Every structure is written in C-alpha cells, then in structure tokens.
C-alpha cells in the first residue's frame, strides 16, 4: 500500500504539472488583457508583467512562474477583475461560501441516498424498487442547472418561500443565510442522492443474494439483522470510498450552480476569470480544480485497502 500510495502521489504531481504547464503556455500565447495608461494600477500591472517575463520566451516565463509559486507561493496579481490584488488572497476569501454550500449538500444527500438505496434493494422487483430505480435514472440524466431553474421557478417565484439568490455577506451560520443557501443546496443534492441510491441498491442487491447471507439466515438471524450486521458491512467497501470522495470534492463546488444562485465562491470566480479574462486567476483556479480531482481519486483508491484489509492496491498477485 505504501509503495502504491507513493506511486499514485508522484503520478498525481506529474499530471498536475503537465496540466498547469499546458494551460500556462496556451494562455501566454494569447495577448495579455490591455490596461489603460489612465488606470491607477497601470504601473503596478506593467511592473508585474515585466517581472514575470511577459516579453521573454514561453519556457522562461513558465520557469519564472514556477519559481514564484514554489519559493514565495506567489500566484500573481489580478490584472482584470480585481486589479492589483493578490489572486491567492482573493481565492481564499471565496472559499468559505463554496465549502459551506457543498457541505450542507453532502450532509443532506448522503443519508437520503443510502436509505433510498437500502429500501429499493429490500423491495427488489416490486413497484417500489422500479419507481425508485426509474426516478434515479431520470435524476442522474438531467443536468443540475435544470433543477436550479425549476427550484427557482417553484420555490422562489411561484411559492415565494425561498430567495432567488444567496444572501450577501459572511454571516454563514445565521438562519437568513441558510435559507438563502437552500435553493443551491437542493440543486446540488439531487444528483448526489441519485448516485448514492443507485450505488447502494446495486451493491446491496448483490450482497443479499450471496451464499453467506443464506447461511446467516439459517443460523437464526432475521432478515433485518442479517442485512444490518452483514450485508451493509460488505456494501460499505464500495459506498464509503464514494463518501470520502464527495467530502474531498466539497471545495470544488459547482461552476454553474454558483453562477445561477450568485454564490460568491471559487466556482463563480473561475467563470468570471474566464470571461474577463483574468489569466493569473484562471491559472490558480485551474490548478486548484485539477488538484482536487486528483486528490479525490487517490483517496478513493487508497481507502479501499483501509476499509477492507483483503484488498491490496497495486499488488500483482
């Protein structure tokens, strides 16, 4: 496991380096956003671009960029959206909104998804199972932004129960702020609930038909006891890594959902950096989203070995 983990981490770093390098070079091939001489930050931006070697060969520019990141953790300054401000400070300031909205979504979605999956598996080949399975496939097939518009139409426009967009401010743990987050939380939750429902039902259905479950029943355990003590424990080998992956991914947020509900998070910052365009912000966000995806994949893979000692990742035997 240790050897496998080290290999995965090294491959992750290599992948991250290649993706950042490709994005950096492709962006620097484009002309930098123009800055008016009348802008009060004109001299700062020009001096910064000179220091980062905008007039030098691309590989030299990339080397200067890597040196600034690794020696000073300096990702540059915004030259379009937040002119003159440090992009990493801007990024950190946007993180709490993204994390809190996605954390609410996960805490709401995982229990419901697992319970629906268990219920569907226990009612296999009944109308309840067919209804849950069909609804799950429909929900998974529909993009999250469709739910966002439906929620806004029904709960915000027609019923007037919820606001259209997230409340401004940083009072994240007040009732007013939580209420304003609910539409985004609901829109993010549908897909997660459906995913866990499908996974749980598939795994539990297979386990319930295993021979060891028949043996457990013949020893006098009721169906409920056998399911809770044995079947669910075996299902967790697949379900728990998915939960770990979801929790790692809470920082990534949702680009479209954050834009629709005006969530001041990193997702909306990413979209704005593309539209501006703001190249330093774009590079930092790209590195972040790539790193989160790679770390989540590694944690999911490694967690299999810790959950079930019989699994040895990377073993040739």
Model-derived features: positions:
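Alpha-helical transmembrane segments of integral membrane proteins
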Residues: 2-3, 91, 95-128, 144, ...
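N-terminal signal-anchor/signal peptide hydrophobic helix marking the start
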Residues: 6-15
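An internal, D/E-rich "acidic patch" concept
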Residues: 54-114
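Hydrophobic alpha-helical transmembrane segments of membrane transport/permease proteins
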Residues: 16-64, 159-177
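Hydrophobic alpha-helical membrane-insertion segments
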Residues: 17-22, 137-150, 242-247
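Membrane-water interface segments at transmembrane-helix boundaries in multipass membrane proteins
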Residues: 77, 133-195
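Hydrophobic alpha-helical segments of integral membrane proteins
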Residues: 9, 44, 48, 58-70, ...
């Amino acid at each position: 496991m240790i050897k496998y983990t080290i290999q995965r981490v090294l491959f992750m770093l290599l992948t991250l380096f290649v993706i950042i390098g490709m994005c950096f070079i492709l962006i620097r091939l484009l002309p930098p956003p123009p800055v008016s001489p009348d802008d009060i930050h004109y001299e700062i931006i020009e001096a910064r671009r000179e220091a980062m070697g905008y007039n030098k060969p691309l590989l030299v520019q990339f080397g200067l960029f890597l040196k600034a990141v690794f020696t000073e953790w300096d990702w540059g300054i915004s030259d379009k959206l937040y002119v003159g401000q440090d992009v990493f400070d801007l990024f950190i300031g946007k993180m709490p909104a993204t994390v809190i909205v996605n954390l609410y979504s996960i805490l709401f979605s995982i229990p419901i998804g697992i319970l629906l999956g268990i219920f569907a598996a226990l009612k296999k080949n009944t109308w309840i199972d067919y209804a849950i399975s069909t609804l799950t496939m429909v929900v998974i097939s529909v993009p999250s932004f469709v739910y966002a518009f439906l929620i806004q139409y029904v709960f915000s426009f027609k019923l007037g129960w919820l606001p259209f967009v997230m409340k401004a401010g940083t009072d994240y743990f007040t009732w007013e702020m939580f209420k304003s987050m609910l539409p985004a939380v609901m829109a993010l939750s549908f897909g997660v609930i459906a995913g866990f429902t499908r996974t749980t039902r598939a795994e539990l259905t297979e386990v319930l038909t295993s021979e060891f479950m028949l043996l457990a029943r013949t020893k006098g355990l009721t169906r409920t006891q056998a399911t809770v003590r044995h079947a669910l424990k075996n299902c967790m080998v697949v379900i728990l890594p998915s939960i770990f992956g979801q929790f790692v991914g809470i920082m990534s947020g949702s680009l479209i959902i954050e834009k629709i509900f005006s969530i001041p998070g990193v997702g909306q910052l990413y979209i704005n950096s593309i539209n501006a365009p703001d190249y330093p912000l774009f590079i930092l966000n790209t590195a972040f989203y790539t790193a989160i995806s790679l770390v989540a994949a590694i944690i999911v893979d490694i967690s299999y070995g810790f959950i079930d000692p019989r699994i040895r990742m990377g073993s040739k035997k």
